[in-house]
Amino acid sequence: MKQILRKAIALILAVTAVLFPLAQTATLIRTTDSAKLASQIETADANSVVIKAAIEKHYDGDGWNFEPRTSDGVHITPQGDGMHLKGHPDEAFFVFEKTAALEFTAEFDAGWTYNSKYSYFFGNDSEAAEVKKLADGSVKFTYKVKKGEKIAVTELTAACVNATADALPRLDISIDCDFESVTKDEWVNAKISLQLGTKVFASGNYNGSGKVKGRGNSSWGYDKKPYSIKLDEKTSLLDIPKTKKYAIVASYTDSTLMRNYITYKAYQDLIGIDYVPKCEFVDVYLNGKYNGIYILVERISIEKNKINIAEADEDNITGGYLIEKNVHGRVNYKKDQVFDCPYQANQVKDHFVLEEPEIEDTELRREVLQYLNVYMQRLHNSVMGFSSEQYTEYIDEDSWVDFVIVQEISKNIDGNLKTSCWMYKERDNNKLYMTALWDFDLAYGIVNWSNADEERNDASDCPGSGTYEDFMIINSSCPWIKKLYQQDEFRELLTERYTCYRTTVIAELQALIPEQAAYLAKAEDANYKLWKKNFCLGVANLQTWLNGRLEWLDEVWLIEN
């Protein structure tokens, strides 16, 4: 019965999220009605880990220290009775012990304006909550509490004040020919400049030169095309660590423009995966013509600030190697350094591609690829139980656990060890490490298909990515993930890690959606006029889907204390 009630409440919350995008976990709320309180406990119980973490952070033994989340460009100043609410926790609720008014003022830096649509302040209780815009552009927030009343802990932590930027950074790329003639195969000389927008970056503006070419697999076929950039000199753009290698990702299939962005930003602090690409939003102009909002992101490579390993050489071919898992249709057999995949998740042959180092010597390349063939077969045998060697001798559990969690949260159809999956092997170390999360523009419920067809051997076991329920990569035809998940040690580490992340990086993932929606709210108007993508509906759908997905994963992975 409890699970049925939870699902019913989840459905109500999902509908609410479409109508009121910021009411993500707020359950209701300010009441002394015992029947209403009882109905909320079912939802609160499912969030007990989140609630416990919130109490530990905000309750000081005497009351609640109220701390609304604020975006860039926002500054909070307490007013009146301040930001401390006298009271005590009571299971999933907080009981006020004093009648008082919670008051603060939000001020905004130049170029930033308050976004009421993507901010949230006790939205389910309009009688007690007041948001008032003042003549000087600041906004005053007031919430009146009464002694003896209760409020859901999740409502106290849901408050956020988010602002919209007047302008995004502007990235100009100019070449001597039309961009229609640019291909994925040949670099074209380019003049490249970057002018900062409203958001402050210490790296400042940029004027320089480099090269550009097309990039992507299916994304290259869309009208809004992605590009790779190679600067002439290592440079920090938008505070991304110095590198020559950048890309601009079009996010054409993603009406929110942010699926890749929130993934890369939220997961910078993973425990097991030691590198996630850095990125920022930009307005892109190609030969002076506006082409929409893109994500400027550093390209994956072996570098000090990225994947910091020593490259293999002729004296030591055990590593290090940067490897991408890819499929038959996306491999260039003439140019790529290809070696075999021991399993067959597709009807045609699966492959690994050695991305770095690029080996010029033909004989050394042959020797290295043969070494990697043998290595991957030994790894496969250990994972599948075909040899006496343990999988822990070849699999770095910490990074693989993180990889599974991230891909399952997003139900990423490109993240099931078939394509766009990156890993590395260090020299004199047998373990394979997952790294560099990449390519989430078809994740988080954006499509209803799953890559489950006869060509990919998934027709019977891989669920649709549009649903909240079921596993994606664990149930896919890649046998490694499924086999690892069957190991008690791996599965226990995964559930412990998920429980830890539920109040840290996953909470950050959720909070980034309204925050970045507010940030892009003005800039996306021009993007909409060009590409006709419904941003607001996309944001609401993304929030609803992610909340539903986490509800299901909580039931199977969350460890209740």
Question: Where are the regions that the model predicts?
Answer:
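N-terminal Sec-pathway targeting helices
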Residues: 2-11
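Hydrophobic core
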Residues: 13, 17-21
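Beta-rich interaction/scaffold domains
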Residues: 26-160
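Conserved NTP-binding catalytic cores of kinases and kinase-like/nucleotidyltransferase enzymes
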Residues: 98-99, 108, 114-117, 156-262
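Middle-to-C-terminal accessory/interaction subdomains
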Residues: 216-218, 222, 348-417, 421-425, ...
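Structural recognition of the beta-strand scaffold that forms the well-ordered cores
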Residues: 226-230, 246-250, 257, 265, ...
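Internal "kinase-insert"/substrate-recognition segments embedded within catalytic cores
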Residues: 235-236, 250-252, 272-277, 290-405
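Short, well-structured beta-strand/strand-turn elements
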Residues: 269-283, 412
